[in-house]
């Protein structure tokens, strides 16, 4: 980089600007600050259904997984509707 280009400033191409912006967006999403529903929640819900189905007959809609975030606190809420057991 020459002294002249340093003083005047280099004109960045739109491709490099777009690349930098995408990198910032990806880093932001990977940090988890912007994700309201992480990628692992659907897989977690499927695995819970598979394990519980070994013991009790339930439908996919009977399991609800919800993640709530506030500041530095994360709460994972899992609601499972089990069928009535007749004795």
UniProtKB/Swiss-Prot annotation:
GO terms for biological process: cell division; regulation of division septum assembly. The keyword RNA-binding does not apply. Keywords: Cell cycle, Cell division. The keyword Cell division applies. InterPro entries: MinE, MinE_sf. Disulfide bonds: none annotated. NCBIfam families: minE (TIGR01215), PRK00296.1 (NF001422), PRK13989.1 (NF010595). Prevents the cell division inhibition by proteins MinC and MinD at internal division sites while permitting inhibition at polar sites. This ensures cell division at the proper site by restricting the formation of a division septum at the midpoint of the long axis of the cell. Belongs to the MinE family. This is Cell division topological specificity factor.
